[in-house]
Amino acid sequence: MAVLSDAQREAGWTIVKLGDIAPLTYGKSLVASKRIPGDIPVYSSAGLIDSHNEAIIDGQNIIIGRKGTIGSITWSEGPAYPIDTTFYTAGTDKTNIKYLYYLLKTYKFSAMNTDSAVPGLNRVTFESQEAVLPPLDEQERIARILGSLDDKIEANTRLIQTMEDYVHTMIKKISKSDSVKRLAIKDLAVHEKNQELPREHVDGVIHHYSLPAYDSGKTPGLEEADSIKSNKFIIDKPCVLFSKLNPGTPRIWLVNPEEGVNSYASTEFIVLTPKENVDIANLWATCSEERISQNLADMASGTSTSHQRVRPTDILNSKILDLSNQSEICSITSYIEALRKENLQLAETRDALIKRLIG
């Protein structure tokens, strides 16, 4: 139950229902076979999953996971297509939409699951939740503070992408040389398989390397261990995560887990650690070569291009460039990792401020 302090009451804060400030609308079905590639992002409860040529919402909206990853909160800045595993809301004239976005992040909607078979968030349950709401000018002040941190994260993410694109250009150039040999991934890396259910071993927040986290800036999600319902790979040393899902849209992630923090990866990845005398930066770079993903896409099985999976053995047998003499890539990736570490620290600061400023 929401409670106001005397200071909040005097400052004009009120207690409202979420339905009063965040009325929900159902997303619309759009199966993969009906999607026409375009510039409109398609969102599911897992976040950004695809593109389409038509939108059903415009402007600033908040997308909330309804089925699957329930309670996930995703920001949408412009035209978009939230599918039927989501709700969405544009708020009301009582709220600053960005403040509402941060407010919704304080709720544990996963605890409101109404379906034991398929996790689900009921609209009535959501809209009946109480919220402490400050006056609009205070909402705007809080949103500016938190938004400044997200703006810095976004700027770092753009710089990271630029540097990664440069590395990929280098790889393309190197691949044209007849003097560079190729080796199977299994000859350069160890396939790590240790996994566990986080909530059975951790009490508190974990770093979760998931596909949505990759798609949202390649920064691990900060999630409560008890919200994770399935086994995850243990990440306790630097590694490369190679996604098995949709190889035509490659997700190759160089990961340096933060010391002292429990870190896990989705089982949609395979976990690769470099063998002796193999530099992890070079392993990541050469795994990211475009022809590797193209070859794997040709071998993938699935009902559509958005639901294809490749076998771990096919990944491990893929022939990648031997970059043992490439030092420039290592220096670039060191800077990339520094930016990623800064993003993680900024996200942790933001989340701490959300708890302090909002509750």
PLM features: what roles do these ranges have?
Residues 281, 285, 294, 327-330, ...:
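Feature representing long, continuous alpha-helical segments
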Residues 1-44, 128-198, 324-359:
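Non-catalytic DNA-recognition/assembly elements of restriction-modification systems
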Residues 44-109, 114-117, 122-126, 232-233, ...:
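A short beta-sheet element
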Residues 90, 132, 321:
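Short hydrophobic/aromatic beta-strand micro-patches
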Residues 16-59, 75-77, 81-88, 186-240, ...:
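Sequence-specific dsDNA recognition surfaces
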Residues 66, 139, 307-308, 326:
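Glutamine-centric residue-chemistry signal
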